[in-house]
Amino acid sequence: MISHTTSPTKLLLFALSVAELLSPAVWAQSKRITAQQVVERIQGQVGVPWKSETVDTFKSGDPKIPVTGIAVTMMATLDVLQRAAASGHNLVITHEPTFYSHEDDPKELPQHENDAVLAAKRRFIAEHGLVIWRFHDHWHDRKPDGIEIGMVHALGWDKYQDPRNQYVFSIPESTLKDLATEIAHKLQIKTLRVVGDPNAKIRRLALSPGASGFANETGALEMSDIQLLVLGETREWETVEYAADAITEGKQKALIILGHIPSEQSGMEECTRWLKTFINEVPVDFVPARNPFWAPQL
């Protein structure tokens, strides 16, 4: 309440304060969606029950801060964080860990929390006011798997997908060498690796993005009609050795190893498209993680 004895100076200051509160900038700030609200909206739209035990949690930053933009990525490397910050995006949604372990726990580092690389990354996050949230488990849990949808679309294999098994495909016949070249071109991979006869004819294959594990990978190779497994990454003394032995035994089997990031990257590009269908208050952009590997020309 303003008294009739209030001085003109105080009235002016009050008027200025009200004008400031009603200014477009302040009004826009007050209506801007927070990081927590973004996640709550995702939980409501993802279409699968939310797990109590999950890695899909905030990894850094204050969930209550207003979001200026959302950067969606496969992996929140420092390079990705720098590009997100430079473009004015303060919420980073990442599929893979930010701090070097599946649980984002630095206990595996010899220096733990005192590790210099970890400290520099955390300092950058804090200095630029970034919020990092992981979206891994529930994006995979969707039916069909969100990562798989994006990868199949990027490879142009939608029409070849087995209706009974989303990970199996019947493609027009191609040699292993030609198919590997085509995949490398479509996914822009410079360091793809192949196991098997380059001239082997391929028609039936399985796609296993990321690191699905020895049991899943050999399960695919054990299927009598599967000639090729396209996968993200694996231990060489597990699936690679298994495939090599199968080939030596005379079985027509092959591997194309994409690398973890390129094997799922298009799945997070698909996630970006999906997020845009129900988040329109702020920009939502895909920030691809760069593949750090390169190979010398022999």
Q: Which sequence ranges carry the predicted segments?
A:
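Bacterial N-terminal signal peptides
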Residues: 12-23
